[in-house]
Regions:
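Conserved alpha/beta-domain cores
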Residues: 254-575
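Non-catalytic, soluble scaffold/interaction modules
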Residues: 1-328, 334-341, 366, 370, ...
Length: 575
């Protein structure tokens, strides 16, 4: 009997193949109390397991396969850091000594406490890091229980094997890569998990968050994985196999055709040129940027330098990362966003408490509250501007006061470089994110003070509609086509165009081809998105006739019902 599971698509593609279930360590461990004279032996067993796990991880790092993304090292470093954390080792040792319990139980109790703390974080990225804690503890438990430190697998050469697991760590995923599996499915995970990041970097179709895949799928079951929609069909009917066989062929043909658009200029049928830039997370994403045909980087998120570490990056480390990207783009524009971190993401000396980080001390607010931290980044960014076409983008601005303080901070950073005799581009452009409704409604202030604007639709929609899209109870209310959102977008894009200030959209709307003609109709001429989305958006632009869409756009902007707007947009896209 056929069964369909719904999950989260994190890496696209269509695969038809057979299931291979990966065994995993159960975290339901036994609890027993031992005589006092055996505690010393138990501590030695625990220490030995920690050291063996450390050696396994260090070995993976030093022997990183050539196909592994460079950020794989950062993931392994994070797992090594978790392994060395006092909450894992020291607290577990204390529990063994004080309660005379077995090592497995002590470790499991400490893990549960850490996971509970991570669950309290508002920020979805930080909340997802609980998965890394669980993966490290699983690895230690395997050592304690005498299981292999890797996921065993045996596959037939050239077979279409689909891995099904409760969860897979980035290190296990890299180790399994040589087996040439066709897709991966997991019960746990999210679009921002480290496993998802590695899967995308390896171009492996992947669906996570399936919840009961391990329960529902049996060894060697025939599966259809639709990585575009996050669907998994177990034991599909002949009709489904036939349908997806055709869809798979169409998908592969489409990818081939899209690659041919790499060198084609993005221009509408009526001759309007459009800039397509890429969003990146790491310097190592440059290869994907070049492959996509992007004409610049519209958003380089600098947070990767600050997360998952005890010591903040110094100026030199930041400078090297920014310069690498600037030089790698060969003179094309590179827009680097100053760190958009919440107060709950900081290391050591910048830790602060926030009951709701999304609305608290984050992004530019944190930068202005930590001037030394901000000055270090600004100096690194300015130094990098000497090596390429670097622009500095400031997130979460909401008032003239914040703009003035930011520009003053940049002026001070420039003066310090002048005093040190260090070269930089004195005319570097400074831009602001429009992601807070207050910024959109006081647009004139931004236009007068800044060189360019970038609309962050993800946060703008959340803040305007008062929706936390990570909250399952209200996520369905997150609507990019809400009339209020369209009015704000029209106001910002139109106002910037009238003033001659460059404006782009760098949120998810920019990378969704379903919204491309809508944004073009609002006057947008610069999009920034994940590199993999760029060919799809470019294809839509190439088939768009702007004068033909003028009348439907007027109707859309006069409509106050989201469902009706969606109908009108469907008609615009079908034209």
């Amino acid at each position: 009997m056929s069964l369909t599971l719904h999950g989260i698509s994190v890496s696209t593609g269509i695969v038809i193949g057979h299931a291979h279930l990966l065994s995993h360590t159960t975290l339901e461990v036994a609890h027993y109390v031992m005589p006092g004279h055996l505690v010393h032996e138990e501590l030695a067993r625990f220490d030995a397991a920690l050291e063996q796990t450390r050696q396994e991880l260090a070995g993976l790092r030093s022997n990183r396969p050539r196909y592994a993304a460079a950020e794989f090292d950062a993931f392994i470093d994070l797992h090594l850091m978790i392994l060395a954390d006092e909450h894992i080792n020291l607290a577990s040792r204390n529990m063994i000594e004080q309660e005379h319990c077995n090592a497995e139980w002590a470790l499991k109790m400490q893990m549960d406490m850490l996971v509970a703390e991570f669950e309290e974080f508002e920020d979805p990225y930080l909340r997802e890091r609980k998965t890394d804690v669980v993966q490290v503890v699983e690895r230690v438990l395997k050592t304690l229980t005498g299981q292999p430190g890797h996921l065993p697998i045996t596959t037939q050469p050239n077979a279409k094997i689909i891995l099904v697991a409760h969860d897979v760590s980035p290190s296990d995923l890299i180790q399994l890569k040589p087996h040439q599996f066709a897709a991966i499915l997991t019960d746990l995970g999210s679009a921002i998990s480290h496993t998802a990041i590695v899967a995308r970097s390896l171009s492996i179709p992947c669906v996570v968050g399936l919840h009961r895949a391990r329960q529902s799928i049996h060894e060697n079951d025939l599966l259809i994985v639709d990585g575009r929609r996050g669907l998994v069909i177990i034991n599909p009917s002949e009709a489904s196999l036939s349908e997806y066989g055709l869809l798979k062929t169409d998908w592969e043909d489409e990818q081939t055709k899209l690659k041919c658009l790499k060198t084609t200029s993005a221009r509408t049928l009526d001759g309007v040129a459009v800039e397509l830039h890429a969003n990146i997370e790491f310097p190592d994403d440059l290869a994907e940027v070049h492959e996509s045909g992007a004409t610049g980087i519209g958003l380089f998120r600098s947070e990767f330098l600050f997360l998952n570490r005890d010591v903040l990056p110094d100026e030199e480390e930041q400078f090297v990362a920014y310069r690498t990207v600037a030089e790698g783009m060969g003179g094309l524009p590179v827009t680097i966003r100053t760190f958009d971190l919440g107060a709950d993401k900081q290391a050591n000396n910048t830790q602060r408490v926030a009951s709701n980080p999304a609305l608290g001390l984050r992004a530019i607010r944190l930068c202005l509250a930590e001037p030394k931290l901000f000055r270090t980044q600004l100096r690194a960014l300015l130094r990098a501007s000497h090596y390429g076409n670097v622009r500095i983008l400031v997130p979460m601005l909401s008032s003239a006061s914040e703009i003035n303080q930011t520009l003053q901070s940049i002026t001070h950073a420039k003066k310090s470089l002048d005093d040190d005799g260090i070269a930089y581009n004195h005319e570097v452009q400074i831009g602001g994110m429009i992601e807070v409704p207050a910024a959109a409604l006081t647009l004139d202030v931004f236009i007068k003070s800044l060189d360019f604007l970038s609309i962050g639709t993800n946060d703008l929609i959340q803040y305007t509609l008062a929706i936390d899209r990570t909250d399952d109870e209200v996520a369905h209310l997150y609507d990019p086509l809400h009339p209020a959102i369209l009015q704000l977008l029209s106001h910002v894009i139109g106002g910037a165009n009238k003033a001659g200030i460059p404006v782009s959209v760098c949120g998810e709307m920019a990378g969704d081809a379903a919204y491309t003609r809508l944004l073009l109709g609002l006057g947008l001429r610069q999009f920034s998105m994940n590199p993999s989305q760029l060919p799809h958006v470019k294809r839509c632009i190439l088939s768009t006739d702007l004068p033909k869409g003028a009348a439907p756009m007027k109707k859309i902007l006069r409509t106050h019902d989201s469902l009706k707007i969606r109908e009108l947009l469907d008609g615009l896209n079908a034209a």
